[in-house]
Amino acid sequence: MKKYLVLFLSILLLGCNGQTRKALNSNLNTKSPIELIIEKEQQAEQKKYSDIGVLISTFEFKVKTNNIKDFEDGFIPWADLEKPEIDLPNLDKKDEIVVNSSSVKIIIDYPLTNQYEFILKSSKGFTRGQLLIEISKHYYWLYEEEENSATIKTIPVDKRTTMYNRNETNGKYGIWGHDIADLDISGISIYKTENGEIILTLNIES
């Protein structure tokens, strides 16, 4: 789930201004926001989907780039979910049919406490480009629904003093740790249930 684990942890630790140590010293039973995010990241990394059904196949999202200094093969191994329209023109094999099914259920569970599901239908199957756009749309919708249903609101980026990461909110999905701007998609796994339903799970980078 993480592109830059070391950088992520470094930003968190630098952003806490020493408050993590104070919190732990004052109450050993209370976890700081930083510790909670790290714990949730680890849980997300370890999550398995074998109980969903049989894994049929997987596919990747790669975006062509001229930045061969950072990406030697000329491809960024993920696509942007915040502004997919920017990556779409250079998305590798964007028009390839990657799911040969007329209906799929897509599960979004990162960075969510309670997962979000939606159904897509298409008589011709689904392409990479189509899935990138649709998944981005649903991320925007669920983030909006979270904000509307939460009593603990998202702290604006310019007002985050102890931690740069998004605070956890208590809306319908319990979003934690990341704004949409942090999120990219690097791959999708295709599962088939016992009753023939096709379910897609997402490999989201942050």
Predicted segments, located by residue:
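Short, contiguous acidic and Ser/Thr-rich linear segments
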Residues: 112-133
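Sec-dependent N-terminal signal peptides
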Residues: 6-9
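Short loop-to-beta-strand transition segments
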Residues: 137-193
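Composition-driven low-complexity segments enriched in polar/acidic and proline residues
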Residues: 23-118
